[in-house]
Structure formats: structure tokens, C-alpha cells
Amino acid sequence: TFDEIFPLLESAFPVTELRMKEDQRALLKEPCYRLYGVRREGTFAATFATWEIEDFLYIEHFAVKEEYRNGGYGGMLLDALLAEKKRPMVVEVELPEDALTRRRIGFYERHGLVFNSYPYLQPPMRKGQGVLPLRLMTKPAAIDAKTYQRYKKRIHSIVYKYEGDL
């Protein structure tokens, strides 16, 4: 349930990458948005939130409970999602500035995503926040500048309800 999932999101993501609880819950009414809770042997273990946008899948959040990390479970879930959706995939990642962010990028790379170096700014997730510098990773391949601009524009308008130019 949402009330099981949201605490995992709060523990796995910085406040700059997560909406307020009721704003996150309101997304459940969005036609392109899907929130999945994954159970392992009956126990809630992981979650991912996706947006099915035109010809690509945008993964907004992906988190595995701490006790299920580092055993290949997250990778198995990601691979299953990719196999099921059969469409290009996009995920935002933090800049590779420290060991943790480099490890996250490496996780996605091991599952076939490519780090794109185009400067990307995530619109604010909460009132009063500024933009967040991130990068896009894509599968099955790196994207050209035209595709990057199209993905960025669609993510900003559909996911963040932001119509400006960042």
C-alpha cells in the first residue's frame, strides 16, 4: 500500500528528490503514473514508480529496503521491469561526485543504461526548493541532443508540471 511504500521512499531519497506525502499520493490519479510495491516471501521489499510517457518509460523512484540490498534483488527487479515494458527507459541520477553516487550510476550501467552528459536540471519537487542538477541515463543506448531535448521537455511537463525552459 502507499502507506507502506512512502516511508521507504523517505529513507531512500533526499528531500530534494521526493514530493510531500500528500503530493506523492495525488500522483496515483495521474493516468501515466504507476506505483509498484514488491513483496518477497510476503514481506514488502521494494518499490518503483514509473511514468509511461509516449514512447519511453521514465523511472521516477526505485528503492529496495535495506535488508534486501546488495544481494542482486534490485537488479533482478530492474531487469524484470525492463523486460516487461519493452520500451526505451530514462532515469535521473545524481552527478557522480562521491562513492555513493558513482555506485548508483554503476548499478544502472550494469543493467544496460548509459550515462548521458547533457546538463539536466530537475524542477523543484517541493515548494521553496531550487532546481537540482542531475543527469539522464537511458536504455538501450545513449541519446542524441534532439532526443535529450524531447525527453527533458516531456518529463518536465508531464512529471513535474513545469513548462519553463531549464
PLM feature segments, named:
Residues 64, 70-83:
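Conserved acetyl-CoA-binding loop-helix of GNAT-fold acetyltransferases
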Residues 27-37, 130:
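A short helix-loop-beta-strand connector motif used in the catalytic cores of GNAT acetyltransferases and
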Residues 1-23, 39, 134-136, 146-166:
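Short amphipathic alpha-helix that is part of the acyltransferase structural core
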Residues 92, 105, 109-129:
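Conserved catalytic-core motifs of GNAT/GCN5-like acyltransferases
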Residues 85-100:
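Conserved GNAT acetyl-CoA-binding A-motif
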